[in-house]
Amino acid sequence: MSSKMAAQTAASTAAAPMGREQWSLLLLLSVLWGGSFLFVGIAIKELPPLTIVLVRVGLAATLLAPVLWMKGLALPATMAAWLPFVIMGALNNVIPFTLIAFGQQTVASGLASILNATTPLFTLIIAHIFTADEKLRSSRFAGVLIGIAGVGVLMGPEAIAGRTSSLLGMSLCLAGCISYGFAALWGRRLRSTP
């Protein structure tokens, strides 16, 4: 990427201050996303991991289809147009949901959510390696560490102890976080897509 393109990309992605609506949506997302670890932890006792992933993705697709229709958007018509979305769906949903569901067979929900809090850290590292305009700075790194510590404090020492957690289960959860990081990088390609 040329320095001119990097400068244009950085300028076009400069963040505007978040308003009440954005903060409300972020809070809703946090509740929904955070609650998923609890529900997966409950479901994993009765259902196989891939069934849980299928139900999550199928339910989301069913709920989002009317939103697509209400916004007047159409599904892509060609395989070439579908490909970027298939890649995004794999990186941001199928791969991490599958890895985390398998990981939660031996990892408590609280610990899984703390491990998931490492997603911004992996995203920073991936962006630093693969982009010209998203380099790792000490302030970003410190912010991520404070965020991870905050999640740990909120979840409590019992979640961190993870007495029944296996190294494989924790590694699967972390691999899911790495996939989320690559999804964020891939999502940069889809910025202009509604």
Language-model regions: role of each:
Residues L32-V40, A65-N116, V153:
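Specific transmembrane alpha-helical segments of multi-pass solute transporters/efflux pumps
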Residues P48-P49, A108, K135:
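A helix-boundary/kink motif common to multi-pass secondary transporters
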Residues S24, L28, L54-L59, L83, ...:
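Hydrophobic residues within alpha-helical transmembrane segments
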Residues G34, G58-T62, I148, G181:
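Small-residue-rich packing faces within the transmembrane alpha-helices of Major Facilitator Superfamily
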Residues L63-L75, P120-L145:
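C-terminal transmembrane-helix exit sites in multi-pass transporters
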Residues I42, P66-W69, F102, T106, ...:
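Membrane-interface helix caps of multi-pass small-molecule transporters
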Residues L64, V86, I126, S138-E158, ...:
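Hydrophobic transmembrane alpha-helices of multi-pass small-molecule transport proteins
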Residues S2-L54, F102, G162-R189:
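Glycine-/small-residue-enriched transmembrane alpha-helix faces in small-molecule transporters
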